[in-house]
Amino acid sequence: MAASLPLSAAIVGAEESVDKEVLEMEYLFEKFLMPSDLCSNTEWLGIPEEHVRKFGMMLEDRDGYSVIFFQDGVVPGKLWCFRYWKSNGVHGLTKGWRCFVREKGLKAGDTISFFRGSACGRLFICCRLGTHATFASSSTLHHGFSMPPPPARPLVGLQSGMLARDVPSLGQARLHDGNQDGGGAPSRHVPSSGRRVEAQLSRVSSRRQRRTMKHSIPEPTIETPPILESMFLIAAPPAVKCLRLFGVNIYVLPVSSSGQPKQESSP
């Protein structure tokens, strides 16, 4: 998979923090949770066989069972230990999975994803709640990692444990009432994310109202009839003169090629 470059805090709209470690992550796979994965009686998360080898080398607990350690993608420094079990060609995670489901509040329709640190080699697990919950593409976590589409490699910042979609941008974090330099009211910090979004939407709507829509009216065009090369112009014939002499109408025709005018008469 192609590696994604680390993004600065200014790009993702998060405030820069001191001593923040950014780790490049490699996407392994994700699983859409079914009701059978959340059954409290079995405590079993089925893993496709082609994805099991992506976990790498497993450890053994004191009872002799294979276990896999995952670092929580949201809570900094928290580790999850799942017992690996294989039976009749079916692979899955057993002991420890029920506790993870209960703490994260997972339900059928949620998605869990697995990642590996490109440099450290540690495994990470993260969950996505609901079918409509999406993670921002090319985003970062202050502690955990982002959830871009599968082909991308997310980033991990080991500090605060917030998703980039939950971190307000610098422009949304504070609202300024008046002008501080001009004697207005000082800026106040608004902790409510809903009020920040509402303020941002009001600014966008006010800018849209000031915009004037200009509709261009096409000017009428006069089409010129085409002139083909085979066409030639013919002069209009001169008008025929009519004279009445002694009760007889005399028509004077145009001059012929011989130079003599033709005359026709009618009673």
Curated annotation (Swiss-Prot):
Compartments where located: Nucleus
Broad class of the protein's primary localization: nucleus
Keyword presence, DNA-binding: yes
Key words, A-Z: DNA-binding, Nucleus, Transcription, Transcription regulation
Protein name per the record: B3 domain-containing protein Os02g0455800
Residue ranges flagged as DNA-binding region: 30-131
PROSITE patterns: B3 (PS50863)
Region (Disordered) location: 172-221
Molecular function in Gene Ontology: DNA binding; DNA-binding transcription factor activity
GO cellular component, one term: nucleus
Superkingdom as given in the UniProt entry: Eukaryota
Lineage: Eukaryota, Viridiplantae, Streptophyta, Embryophyta, Tracheophyta
Compositional bias of kind Basic residues: 205-214
Pfam families noted in UniProt: B3
Cited InterPro entries: B3_DNA-bd, DNA-bd_pseudobarrel_sf, LEC2-like
Keyword Transcription: yes
